[in-house]
From Swiss-Prot:
Lineage summary: Bacteria, Bacillati, Actinomycetota, Actinomycetes, Mycobacteriales
Keywords, alphabetical: Cell membrane, Cell wall, Lipid biosynthesis, Lipid metabolism, Magnesium, Membrane, Metal-binding, Phospholipid biosynthesis, Phospholipid metabolism, Secreted, Transferase, Transmembrane, Transmembrane helix
Domain of life: Bacteria
Binding of Mg(2+) 2, residues: D68, D89, D93
Cofactor note: Contains a di-nuclear catalytic Mg(2+) center.
Pfam families, A to Z: CDP-OH_P_transf (PF01066)
Species: Mycolicibacterium smegmatis (strain ATCC 700084 / mc(2)155)
Protein name: Phosphatidylinositol phosphate synthase
Length: 222
């Protein structure tokens, strides 16, 4: 992950601390903030992107993605999050990503009538879910499945900037959405392959799935 992202995240963590404390004093919990932020982002993506309001869609989703990150700051103020909170956060991230790409796919198909853009957005939709699943499934098996040239923060930055600029008020740049989605599609496929390779080369990856000592074998699902 880039140093720029790490520096930006560190600054956000510092700035969000007073807001996190205020939210906790108001009786909110990290899980409530996670659910509220995700619901708002999903609604924004599925109502604005499909009708071509890409600028406002990008603004709304960006705002609530940042708001959703507040749950982590709140958890830190409480001394750390819970296992359920981590699972809920990851689940909501997948829902948010899916809504963004689903909304853009709809606009590409029925608003722009662009088969090539539909293909790109569908690739991004599928790979965004599979990339995360590879990591979760690998970790559940005690293997390493992280890394790759692009992760969720970079993915969101690329798609939201591309979408926003394509519908920029007074000076739209329609080509930016096509470029952003194809760059993201290619990078996502590469990341998927990198994670599969990371799992394949992890220590113990080639051990038998069904133990010979009669222990219960792993299932194919985490």
């Amino acid at each position: 992950m880039s140093n720029v992202y790490l520096m930006t995240r560190a600054a956000y963590v510092k700035l969000s601390r007073p807001v996190a404390k205020a939210a906790l004093r108001a009786g909110l919990t990290p899980d409530i903030v996670t659910l509220a932020g995700t619901a708002a982002a999903v609604i924004g993506a599925l109502t604005l992107f499909p009708i071509g309001q890409l600028w406002w869609g990008a603004v709304v989703v960006s705002f609530f993605v940042l708001a959703d990150m507040l749950d982590g700051a709140m958890a830190r103020e409480q001394g750390g999050g819970t296992r359920f909170g981590a699972v809920l956060d990851a689940t909501c991230d997948r829902l948010g990503d899916g809504a963004v790409f689903a909304g853009l796919t709809w606009w590409a198909a029925f608003g722009l009538d662009s088969p090539s853009l539909v293909v790109a957005t569908l690739i991004c939709l599928v790979t965004s879910q599979v990339i995360s699943y590879i990591k979760a499934r690998a970790e559940a098996s005690g293997l390493r499945g992280d890394g790759g040239i692009i992760e969720r923060p970079e993915r969101l930055v690329i798609v939201l900037i591309g979408a926003g600029l394509s519908d920029l008020p007074f000076f739209p740049l329609p080509w930016t959405l096509h470029v952003a989605m194809w760059v993201l599609a290619v990078a996502s496929v590469v990341t998927l392959l990198q994670r599969v390779h990371a799992v394949r080369t992890s220590p113990g990856a080639m051990e038998p799935l069904h133990p010979a000592n009669g222990e219960k074998p792993e299932t194919s699902e985490p």
